[in-house]
């Protein structure tokens, strides 16, 4: 019997770390992405950024706006590659309706948290979020610093 390949590394392609700091996460969803061939090759090379990215629901479809996938030099020689084009998210109708209704509420939006591989498919973890106030951000940072300090103390003893 042939052995299965182990996990050769992390399946995460890109993370939106800023989103976890700037927003309260209410609910998360998993969506597929509709990509071109050169984009998949670039994602395998880890050339993706999710900072300042958001999700727009238009005409019953979900779109990923502001994401940046840098094309490789060896790929897309005959196709003009647009690194920041809008990409379609593949979700169920009920999920799209839920996201649309929640984003209509004041102070709510939908942002991607990370891109990752699931078998051989690219998936996007997205979340319905509410913006944090400045004092919430300070409290989050203070709690994170205290947890780090506790870990240092525990390691020392």
Curated annotation (Swiss-Prot):
This protein's UniProt keywords: Cytoplasm, RNA-binding
SUPFAM superfamilies: Small protein B (SmpB)
Compartments, as annotated in UniProt: Cytoplasm
Keyword Cytoplasm: yes
Annotated GO MF terms: RNA binding
Annotated GO CC locations: cytosol
Major subcellular location class: cytoplasm
GO terms for biological process, alphabetical: trans-translation
NCBIfam families: PRK05422.1, smpB
UniProt-listed PANTHER family: SSRA-BINDING PROTEIN (PTHR30308:SF2), TMRNA-BINDING COMPONENT OF TRANS-TRANSLATION TAGGING COMPLEX (PTHR30308)
Family the UniProt entry places it in: Belongs to the SmpB family.
Function: Required for rescue of stalled ribosomes mediated by trans-translation. Binds to transfer-messenger RNA (tmRNA), required for stable association of tmRNA with ribosomes. tmRNA and SmpB together mimic tRNA shape, replacing the anticodon stem-loop with SmpB. tmRNA is encoded by the ssrA gene; the 2 termini fold to resemble tRNA(Ala) and it encodes a 'tag peptide', a short internal open reading frame. During trans-translation Ala-aminoacylated tmRNA acts like a tRNA, entering the A-site of stalled ribosomes, displacing the stalled mRNA.
This protein's name: SsrA-binding protein
